[in-house]
Amino acid sequence: MGYDEAIIHLGDFGRYQKIIYFLICLTSIPVAFHKLAGVFLLAKPDFRCALPFENGSSYDLPTHLWNLSYPENERCSYYDVDYTEEYLNGSIPRSSNETKTCSSYVYDRSKYLNSAVTEWNLVCGRDFMAATSDSLFMLGVLLGSIVFGQLSDKYGRKPILFASLVIQVLFGVLAGVAPEYFTYTFARLMVGATTSGVFLVAYVVAMEMVGPDKRLYAGIFVMMFFSVGFMLTAVFAYFVHDWRWLQIALTLPGLIFMFYYWIIPESARWLLLKGRKDCAIANMQKAARFNKVEISDEALSELLDEGENSEEKAKQKLEDQELDEGPPPSVWDLFCYPNLRRKTLLIFLDWLVTSGVYYGLSWNTSNLGGNVLLNFVISGAVEIPAYIFLLLTLNRWGRRSILCGCLVMAGLSLLATVIIPQRMHTLIVACAMLGKLAITASYGTVYIFSAEQFPTVVRNVALGAASMVARISGMMAPFLNFLATIWKPLPLLICGSLTLVAGLLSLLLPETHNKPMLETIADGERFGKKTKADVYLETGQELRAPEAQPLKGSGETNGSTIANGHK
């Protein structure tokens, strides 16, 4: 009852909700722009040292000049010799094998006109700086999810969404005009923080616009708009070849969303939570009029009161329970009991691998060879069928089966790219994209699966901790791709191995589909644990179990026991 019941009386997912939902989903597109722009902003083309006798030369050199100038497989130094005409035409041998470190570079501009890497020479001893910049962007995403999440709960969804968009535009433009690396990196960190502010708030508002039976679809369609933004990033990169103008071009569409301040209503759920019932009813009546539904303020108020009373009773029951049991359970309680600890570590591993591999693959398209833009578009496009697959199967198949199957498929596909001969380029890209499709489906599954594994008393904080693990792995992803400088297939080898292991270990987690939600720490400890009672029942033997000890948060009073199996 309550707000969910009121939504149904307003026309459920009526015309008003559809329009607002669509407008909210559009904000996911610029979020994708900024999260994936680093592939082109920090693109690293082929390069070589600029030789002393060169002045504005092109990247290409005749083979004999290359052999005379550079040691084998070396791009960061050249032979320290006198490059006379006689030496260059081969008339005299090389006088020394001593090398000299580059002072300037020549870049291959056949794929990229320029990038932040070519402008600030982020190669050789400075090549880690490009990965560091992307990693700090993901640090911004982590910080933004903490800061903007709390602010939206305190001040409302609408003002924080608008503030995030304004800050995003300002720092997005600053990144495009940054005079040097550190200003650029700081601006990108701030943009990363605002992507959380925009996407997190938009996602919450989108979910609050619909009833419980449509939230699965609402959440996945938001992600589909992110995938559209993924692909559109390549379209911008195709037409805008200068990295500075590309950054600005990807930022300016955010100005369109400034008009949302006068269009998007404040969340009715948030207004009710803050006791602003009259404002919530006014917003809901606006939706009713747009949907051509007639409902009186009194009827709406009665529906909301019923929900409010139910929530207050549940809250009071929880408070009374906490007083009886002492301090409320925390995320640390997940590590105090063996079965809960095992499941928690497995879930954290799934989040770590899924997030790291997702971003690693998204940013690794330039290392696959061939047409970088085409690889990038395909990498975004394969996310759509992944989400459609989830829509069709999440409520039909087991969560564990989907998560395990998708992770194993991703692992095998990525490992296949390592053993396929390099000349079979199309097959390598196809396997990598199949891996991307599977890891995207895993990403969509792991959240629901995790929420059903954790007890209610610690569910929110546990999911927050799991999300934190995912953000940390996202920060590691740029350095994972950096390993391609050692051996090109190494990132895919690591991603494939980790994903395969995580998928197989997921079989150790209990299935949650069509199972009741866990309420207490004791429920969480028992769930998926094969007790002596189960063993005796399977063998037909009589069970005489000793009295079990109470678990924290079990819902039992002090001194009582929890039955460990059947009587």
Swiss-Prot record:
Chain residue ranges for the region called Disordered: 304-326, 546-567
Cytoplasmic side: 1-21, 149-158, 211-219, 266-343, 393-400, 449-462, 511-567
Topology within the bilayer: Multi-pass membrane protein
Bias-annotated ranges (Polar residues): 555-567
One example of a Gene Ontology biological process annotation: positive regulation of cell growth
GO cellular component: membrane
Keywords: Glycoprotein, Ion transport, Membrane, Transmembrane, Transmembrane helix, Transport
Pfam family of the protein (one): Sugar_tr
Residue ranges annotated as Extracellular topological domain: 43-127, 180-189, 241-244, 365-371, 422-427, 484-489
Entry function: Probably transports organic cations.
Protein family per UniProt: Belongs to the major facilitator (TC 2.A.1) superfamily. Organic cation transporter (TC 2.A.1.19) family.
Protein name per Swiss-Prot or TrEMBL: Organic cation transporter-like protein
Species name: Drosophila melanogaster
Classification lineage: Eukaryota, Metazoa, Ecdysozoa, Arthropoda, Hexapoda
Gene name for this UniProt entry: Orct2
